[in-house]
Amino acid sequence: MPGMRRLLIVLLSVVPLYGASPEIFRVRLDTTKGPIVIEVHREWAPRGADRFHELVTSGYFDDSRFFRVVKGQWAQFGINGDPAVATRWRGRTIPDDPPKQSNVRGTVTFAFAVPNGRTTQVYIALKNLADPQDAQGFVPFGRVVEGMDVADSLNSEYGENAGSGIRAGKQQPLFDGGNAYMDRAYPRLDRILHAKVIP
């Protein structure tokens, strides 16, 4: 038992503890095209809302690229530009939330490859994606309340080529090379300059 207690103390000293996020909060993404404001509803997806709050308040999204933008479909982000940081978070999965909201235009949802596999990648629905996203377990945790025109204007010239979705299995260069790779291979990707919780 003393060994378990020591292990717990060590774990608590190296793993940051984040509590529950506020029930409703707003996040402003200052992007290269202008601001996008997301209103998060914890009731929709508690685990997703808590993780998003944790990522924003830790600075994870700052200087990250919108690496997967398909015009009229989605705008995806959430791979940190520092390969060490991105890799460290890649294995920190959260359990699924039961669906309560539909993937309609403007909703914000975690992407994932397998059940209970959400980590850091998020997409904004640029159109109604309820079919097939709802049936596949993609659970919105928020919605864009300001700046949907900004989301629509994000550079989509690279489409699925700059990493694609998690399930496509083509993201390793983004994790290995970070922003240096993305800026070299896809220099016109739009990015998040800074993300923060706002009143």
What are these model-derived regions, one by one?
Residues 17-199:
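Cyclophilin-like peptidyl-prolyl cis-trans isomerases
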